[in-house]
């Protein structure tokens, strides 16, 4: 199975399955001398981990990360960093009924078509459980970006179902279980989630992630454009079906005179481009959005087939998120951090001596 690695100079390779013994990853490219402890990684893992509220799956995994290598006396050595999280709350018996049945909307059918077999326990490698290691690796990148370059990455929920959420207060995001920046909408989200649980159904969501303090010049035209790599990283997250950079699809309704981000000696007058022009960061805030589909793991009966081609009715058992967008917020932050750190290292490697007299804001 290929496709388990992201990045060129900052490289993250993950391994493990939902109901296997453990999840792990190898992080290459971390510069030496960076202070790093397991506690530095645990905060974001706790934000992502299951069982933290009544609105998410009740699978209770502590997600305690272990640093196996690459750190000595509290600082990175410049060698590969090995990370491990043990699985402790698997209930594989919940999935015995789907051993020969393809859950509609899941990767069961496509994995079996590709490999001729599949790990049906919680989806195996296709499960979003794998993203725990992305968050751990992303926490390393976030720490490096913040401490060495002053880059701060934040994410939040900006829509659930037909409830749009305004980014009114970033401080509110960590104060509620929805990662919601709009305190006026929390009651509506709670009501929607209660209704979904009662119905046994699920709902989609939109997540926004931003990066402040990114310098101008990151991105490698033409095939490794910064926006292309961000979209690639975000699209690799489970359940993501669309990614927008800046105004995204809204630019269709704009005229060129409206959409262009005009420049004065004080700086840019707008940021429709989301901080990226020609695939290269402009020094403005980087803005990305991703759309997540409603999970197909629901108790509403649905039609499917088994591996023998027979039609059957499917009701998904197990412990699942009514809205996967909630726990996707720290995952989106991690993926953006991984991409930005990779491009920072690439920029330093090729263009460290480049100086310009052009203003930077």
UniProtKB/Swiss-Prot annotation:
Disulfide bonds: none annotated. It comes from Citrobacter koseri (strain ATCC BAA-895 / CDC 4225-83 / SGSC4696). Homotetramer. This is Chorismate synthase. Pathway: Metabolic intermediate biosynthesis; chorismate biosynthesis; chorismate from D-erythrose 4-phosphate and phosphoenolpyruvate: step 7/7. GO terms for cellular component: cytosol. GO terms for molecular function: chorismate synthase activity; FMN binding. Its EC number is 4.2.3.5. Its cofactor is FMNH2. One of its GO terms (biological process) is aromatic amino acid family biosynthetic process. Keywords: Amino-acid biosynthesis, Aromatic amino acid biosynthesis, FAD, Flavoprotein, FMN, Lyase, NADP. InterPro entries: Chorismate_synth, Chorismate_synth_AroC_sf, Chorismate_synthase_CS. CDD domains: Chorismate_synthase. NADP(+) binds at residues 48, 54. Belongs to the chorismate synthase family. This reaction introduces a second double bond into the aromatic ring system. It catalyses: 5-O-(1-carboxyvinyl)-3-phosphoshikimate = chorismate + phosphate. FMN binds at residues 125-127, 238-239, 278, 293-297, 319. It comes from the Bacteria. Pfam families: Chorismate_synt.
């Amino acid at each position: 199975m290929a496709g388990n690695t992201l990045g060129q100079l900052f490289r993250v390779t993950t391994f493990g399955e939902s109901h296997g013994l453990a999840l792990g990853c190898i992080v290459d490219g971390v510069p030496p001398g960076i202070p790093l402890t397991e506690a530095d990684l645990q905060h974001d893992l706790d934000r992502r981990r299951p069982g933290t509220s009544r609105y998410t799956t009740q699978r209770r995994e502590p997600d305690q990360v272990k640093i196996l290598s690459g750190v000595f006396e509290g600082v990175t050595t410049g060698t590969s960093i090995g990370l491990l999280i043990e699985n402790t709350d698997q209930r594989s018996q919940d999935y015995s009924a789907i051993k020969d049945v393809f859950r509609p909307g899941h990767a069961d059918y496509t994995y079996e078509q590709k490999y001729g077999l599949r790990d049906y326990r919680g989806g195996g490698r296709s499960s979003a459980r794998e993203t725990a290691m992305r968050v751990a690796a992303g926490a390393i990148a976030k720490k490096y970006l913040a401490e060495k370059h002053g880059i701060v990455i934040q994410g939040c929920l900006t829509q659930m179902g037909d409830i749009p959420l305004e980014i009114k207060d970033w401080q509110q995001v960590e104060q509620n279980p929805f990662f919601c920046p709009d305190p006026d909408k929390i009651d509506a989200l709670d009501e929607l989630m209660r209704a979904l649980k009662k119905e046994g159904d699920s709902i989609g969501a939109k997540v926004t992630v931003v990066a402040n303090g990114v310098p101008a010049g990151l991105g490698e035209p033409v095939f490794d454009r910064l926006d292309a790599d961000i979209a690639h990283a975000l699209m690799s997250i489970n359940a993501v079906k669309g990614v927008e950079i800046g105004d995204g699809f809204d630019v269709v309704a704009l005229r060129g005179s409206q959409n262009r981000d005009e420049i004065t000696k004080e700086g840019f007058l707008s940021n429709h481009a989301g901080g990226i022009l020609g695939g290269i960061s402009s020094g403005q805030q980087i803005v990305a959005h991703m759309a997540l589909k409603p999970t197909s793991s629901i108790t509403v009966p649905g039609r499917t087939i088994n591996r023998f081609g027979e039609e059957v009715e499917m009701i998904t058992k197990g412990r699942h998120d009514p809205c996967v967008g909630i726990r996707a917020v720290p995952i989106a932050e991690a993926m953006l951090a991984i991409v930005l750190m990779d491009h920072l290292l690439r920029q330093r490697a090729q263009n460290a001596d480049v100086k310009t007299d052009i203003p930077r804001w």
